[in-house]
Amino acid sequence: MAVQESAAQLSMALKVQEYPTLKVPYETLNKRFRAAQKNIDRETSHVTMVVAELEKTLSSCSAVDSVVSLLDGVVEKLSVLKRKAMESIQAEDESAKLCKRRIEHLKEHSSDQTAAINMWKKKRMDRMMVEHLLRCGYYNTAVKLARQSEIEDLVNIEMFLTAKEVEESLERQETMTCLAWCHDNKSRLRKMKSCLEFSLRIQEFIELIRQNKRLDAVRHARKHFSQAEGSQLDEVRQVMGMLAFPSDTHISPYKDLLDPARWRMLIQQFRYDNYRLHQLGNNSVFTITLQAGLSAIKTPQCYKEDGTSKNPDCPVCSKSLNKLAQPLPLAHCANSRLVCKISGDVMNENNPPMMLPNGYVYGYNSLLSIRQDDKVVCPRTKEVFNFSQAEKVYIM
């Protein structure tokens, strides 16, 4: 029964933590399928048009040269259709194989062999680290780790490298790469009600004002802001006011609009929409897992100022993780467990808690191990007591 419960808990943890592992390649497959459908429909319509023109020419008994020319056109269109279909099918097949590979990898956690399970856990940890490094911008390190661990097909490197190109272009104060990304994901972004493309167009308008190209700014506004409504219309009205002020104005809000820090806001907005597009959380799985683990073992003893109650084997008590765990909730414990300060063993009926006259409690077995000539020395205060002075503690 306990084994089944443990397996069920592991299965639930996989569903929660490994969602991005399958969701990202699935979304890529879905996107490629829709693109293939559009490409094939478009090329099929081209073939239909030239075939109809050929049939019309044949019915009118035209010259042989005209028929041959039209036949060449039909062959050309069919060749293009075949090439586009093969390219689309190959791209879909690659995405489908990637989904299958990741499903097979996740199934390995239920292996009966201990060595296989340990290897799977190692790969899982490496996957978490790669994703975390990618989110933090350490792309080269992440790629090297993925290659060294042979998990390149189990992590979403391509997605993050694409995002890297977009973010770097925004850092250079360029919008074309990000606008191309918006165009590639236009339908999904529209369903998400994303304002990223609108924000980019606003920034382009601001840059034209900064360069004193006011007529170009007006043309830009007519082209891209004519359909604005609601809150977007209010923003358009605000930026249009910049036409009446110099580019070095100190009047608010135009001074804020001209602040180069807006590019950093665009990067954050792109990152947020990119995560939403692939249904990823704002934090990496590694961060979430680490925080959950720290919270599960965090106790008030980890933050005692005197430092005497800290356990050297406790991750939360360690200097590197103590500050990180500070804002996290304490561990939920329905049934308290008393742990001996000396040995680290649980104090129970086989190792009852014993209280010395100074109020400190230790396990009976630990007091026996440090007893000398019927005397015990308190490890905390260095006070010496008779062993018979230790009293048994009862927990109600």
Swiss-Prot record:
Residues 121-153 form the LisH domain. GO terms for molecular function: actin binding; ubiquitin protein ligase activity; zinc ion binding. One of its GO terms (biological process) is erythrocyte maturation. Its EC number is 2.3.2.27. The keyword Lyase does not apply. Pfam families: CTLH. The record marks 314 as: Essential for ubiquitin ligase activity. Signal peptide: none annotated. A zinc finger (RING-Gid-type) spans 314-381. One of its GO terms (cellular component) is plasma membrane. SUPFAM superfamilies: RING/U-box (SSF57850). Residues 159-216 form the CTLH domain. Coiled coil: none annotated. The keyword Membrane applies. Its main location: nucleus. It is an enzyme of class 2 (transferase). Keywords: Actin-binding, Cell cycle, Cell division, Cell membrane, Cytoplasm, Cytoskeleton, Erythrocyte maturation, Membrane, Metal-binding, Nucleus, Transferase, Ubl conjugation pathway, Zinc, Zinc-finger. It catalyses: S-ubiquitinyl-[E2 ubiquitin-conjugating enzyme]-L-cysteine + [acceptor protein]-L-lysine = [E2 ubiquitin-conjugating enzyme]-L-cysteine + N(6)-ubiquitinyl-[acceptor protein]-L-lysine. InterPro entries: CRA_dom, CTLH/CRA, CTLH_C, Fyv10_fam, LisH, ZF_RING_GID. It is found in: Nucleus matrix; Cell membrane; Cytoplasm, Cytoskeleton. SMART domains: CRA, CTLH, LisH. Identified in the CTLH complex that contains at least MAEA, RMND5A, GID8, WDR26, and RANBP9 and/or RANBP10 as the catalytic core. Interacts with F-actin. Core component of the CTLH E3 ubiquitin-protein ligase complex that selectively accepts ubiquitin from UBE2H and mediates ubiquitination and subsequent proteasomal degradation of the transcription factor HBP1. MAEA and RMND5A are both required for catalytic activity of the CTLH E3 ubiquitin-protein ligase complex. MAEA is required for normal cell proliferation. The CTLH E3 ubiquitin-protein ligase complex is not required for the degradation of enzymes involved in gluconeogenesis, such as FBP1. Plays a role in erythroblast maturation and in the development of mature macrophages. The expected RING-type zinc finger domain is highly divergent and most of the expected Cys residues are not conserved. Still, the protein is required for CTLH complex E3 ubiquitin-protein transferase activity. In addition, the conserved Cys-314 in this highly divergent region is required for ubiquitination by the yeast GID complex, suggesting a direct role in catalyzing ubiquitination. PANTHER family: E3 UBIQUITIN-PROTEIN TRANSFERASE MAEA, MACROPHAGE ERYTHROBLAST ATTACHER-RELATED. This is E3 ubiquitin-protein transferase MAEA. The lineage of its organism: Eukaryota, Metazoa, Chordata, Craniata, Vertebrata. The gene is maea.
